[in-house]
Amino acid sequence: MHPAGEKRGGRPNDKYTAEALESIKQDLTRFEVQNNHRNNQNYTPLRYTATNGRNDALTPDYHHAKQPMEPPPSASPAPDVVIPPPPAIVGQPGAGSISVSGVGVGVVGVANGRVPKMMTALMPNKLIRKPSIERDTASSHYLRCSPALDSGAGSSRSDSPHSHHTHQPSSRTVGNPGGNGGFSPSPSGFSEVAPPAPPPRNPTACSAATPPPPVPPTSQAYVKRRSPALNNRPPAIAPPTQRGNSPVITQNGLKNPQQQLTQQLKSLNLYPGGGSGAVVEPPPPYLIQGGAGGAAPPPPPPSYTASMQSRQSPTQSQQSDYRKSPSSGIYSATSAGSPSPITVSLPPAPLAKPQPRVYQARSQQPIIMQSVKSTQVQKPVLQTAVAPQSPSSASASNSPVHVLAAPPSYPQKSAAVVQQQQQAAAAAHQQQHQHQQSKPPTPTTPPLVGLNSKPNCLEPPSYAKSMQAKAATVVQQQQQQQQQQQQVQQQQVQQQQQQQQQQLQALRVLQAQAQRERDQRERDQRERERDQQKLANGNPGRQMLPPPPYQSNNNNNSEIKPPSCNNNNIQISNSNLATTPPIPPAKYNNNSSNTGANSSGGSNGSTGTTASSSTSCKKIKHASPIPERKKISKEKEEERKEFRIRQYSPQAFKFFMEQHIENVIKSYRQRTYRKNQLEKEMHKVGLPDQTQIEMRKMLNQKESNYIRLKRAKMDKSMFVKLKPIGVGAFGEVTLVSKIDTSNHLYAMKTLRKADVLKRNQVAHVKAERDILAEADNNWVVKLYYSFQDKDNLYFVMDYIPGGDLMSLLIKLGIFEEELARFYIAEVTCAVDSVHKMGFIHRDIKPDNILIDRDGHIKLTDFGLCTGFRWTHNSKYYQENGNHSRQDSMEPWEEYSENGPKPTVLERRRMRDHQRVLAHSLVGTPNYIAPEVLERSGYTQLCDYWSVGVILYEMLVGQPPFLANSPLETQQKVINWEKTLHIPPQAELSREATDLIRRLCASADKRLGKSVDEVKSHDFFKGIDFADMRKQKAPYIPEIKHPTDTSNFDPVDPEKLRSNDSTMSSGDDVDQNDRTFHGFFEFTFRRFFDDKQPPDMTDDQAPVYV
């Protein structure tokens, strides 16, 4: 026995007590406890004092805890008390004071200046720490603090004094028993000031129990809450590396030496308080509210080990309270501690009021939670949970989790209020529990994590009950999942039904649209067939119109199929839904997706049926249903149709662009010519500069007005019909006057489009318009306006009142040679003017030679004129034409009989060479050249053949190749060498006979290769060709008044009515007019139409502004 272990205050009777006291005395002589001084917070490391005087620093490896002595079974743990050091050792170098802390106990001095023999045996090599709270921070400078700040299961209250002080290094004063060094620092390193004393307990409780004696100030700092520890855990080996920075430092589930000493002394009643045998009652861990009389003690708290191992992740619950630990940043993902936040289940039954109890000797129960109990500041009362003693049959790991409810946050809160709230919550929970048992769980109830009820017994629930509760929770979760799956399936079914309804609605809209399109195609087809039949009846040898330019390739695939019942995609096969316009024609696609079926724009809402088949889509007009339009008048509807955008072939585009560019260039040239002509006239007259400037301004103003007038639309209502002049094969000629210029008369030639198209005269009409528009000389009838409407084409020309040459021939019979010489000379000049413009008239005859009021001639009727342009070629306007078609009179037809045909390049070269030749059979057979009839190619020399035939008719009185039928006439013209005879009774002069022989000859020997060859002939001796129009004509027609038409042949009224344009219905050409492009760029307006210059040559014609 150690000599220091002598008994103080009596020697115990039994052997066990003696051994315990002996061990305690050894501890007191081995360790010296340091105190934290209140003012001086500097920390002094604990050291060993050896016999040889050397002090070894106590490193963290020496902070060991002694294995506690096993108390007797009847002993119970006593509350923490402060044991003052014995008088024999206080103040000595080897003495010290004992401090209960979370770090450990250090020894500064040893009695008698030496280390005890048991020192080596009591210090293990490594500290065995609880593995769940191993941390990375060093623990040598921080002491144990309240578990409310460092434990995951602690309270989340924020009214701790740790958060209100700055950090100051703490220290321990060795040998200072009066210092308040027992106040532990916070985990974050903040220094703490000793808190004030707790509020006074209930006065009713003090009357029933013995009041505790006052605690001396020196030992107030040692008043501590119980530290969580377990004595039934197997020890774990701590890692050899540096410890973590967690402020929670346990003693491997064991008590520190001061706690062991306090518990053992309390169980043996070795330290009576106040010098009497009464036991000193420590301050209770709870705020006692209620008397101490007969109230049953509260049930023991559950096992801390079981609660640590049974914690789950937090989930939403109606009866859960989330208790979060402070975010100190020391818990890592690999920590074995409890997760935070922790679901704490509230017990359904009301809690019993805490009663003061007498600490009796009982079996040792491990303390699982410890917190600082302040004595100076008003702190909330924290909860201390004590783990009950585990039964020997069941292990601690299988115990169910029971966590007590948190106490009120502030001590001022009345216990009655808390009890009422707990009772109300318990009653609501009990009713809800009964309701849940009576009715199946609904899917809206969130899953419960922990056990929602706690049995009203002191013993923990058995393993079977725990497994039953878990099984019930699993079944409830499965039921909820099944109900959620059923709801999802129902929603999917509803969505599918809605999609099917939308698909059916879209299908109905598409069916109605397809039906409308089929009806429209049938109507178009009927109209096309009717027009083709009419055209075939009018001209059986003529080919029909071509089909629309864009055709669809689907003939049998236009059936509308029902859509597949997919969730999101609507597969609808509809050949009519193509892009507009389709270039090239869109092929049928079975996988075409109709994304706009619900927004197609159909407003009729008809529910059409599924179409089994439909006709082939020959023309795509639109991609969406035609909306219903307001009912308007027929005139407005016709006007609207005129501006509808229509599809045309590439030939139409080529035709339009060539004509448009040609007209633009022509307008520029004409404007430049007028400007230069004005400058020439002003320079010739010698006008002053100021006058020249004014003239130029007037010309520019005229040009601007002309451009505006060209854009103005014209119609026949702008003219007033006076009387008819003549009737032709395609229309009529009428004397008219313009409304705004009544002093000028015009001859308006009207051509019906239907007749032009039937007889394939589109190229001729186009050529006549171009010649009359470009001809700006005095030998050609001047064209002022040209325009069109839906049914007719209109030419507004200058009125020539003297009639035509044919009327004069009929009237006179045979011309005198002087009269014939005059008219032949003027005809020669007129033909030369046409040739200079690059045209060939090809229809020179007495009917097309007009005589004006002065007796001079003008050429007209340029319907058969050609300018060697592709727009003047009739083959271009032939229906169903293609690039592979060849002219029947092309030169390589001869090679097909005698040998192989020329190659493609040779044919192209020959075609280019033959471009200057004409191969069409046109004109009157009496006046046409033989090369034209033979289609061997002709040039402008063919017009001089016609001049020779007219001279023959003037002098002889009849055509040279007169016959009973046109076919006989044609044969005579071809065999002209045998059939051309000049009768001697005509008594023609030698010059006239020679000129006829020279003009009516073969093309290689004919006069006319140049106009000078003709003018230099002896027949024209004495004729001044330079001033022909200034000479007085030998014949002046008789004109009684400006509107006199007696010089023309009378018009048959029956013929006139049958050809009246106003009587035509217009249905014959309505469809063709919409699709035909030959009449583009037909409108024309001449410059200076209101002020016409006098008849002058081009060189002398001034520009009137």
UniProtKB/Swiss-Prot annotation:
Annotated Protein kinase domain residues: 719-1020
The cofactors required by this protein are:
Mg(2+)
User: What SUPFAM superfamilies does the database record attribute to this sequence?
Assistant: Protein kinase-like (PK-like)
Gene3D superfamilies given for it?
A: Phosphorylase Kinase, domain 1, Transferase(Phosphotransferase) domain 1
Query: Which UniProt keywords are listed?
Result: ATP-binding, Cytoplasm, Cytoskeleton, Kinase, Magnesium, Metal-binding, Nucleotide-binding, Phosphoprotein, Serine/threonine-protein kinase, Transferase, Tumor suppressor
- Name the family: Belongs to the protein kinase superfamily. AGC Ser/Thr protein kinase family.
What protein does this entry describe?
Serine/threonine-protein kinase Warts
Native source organism of the sequence: Drosophila melanogaster
Q: Lineage in the entry? A: Eukaryota, Metazoa, Ecdysozoa, Arthropoda, Hexapoda
Its gene name is wts
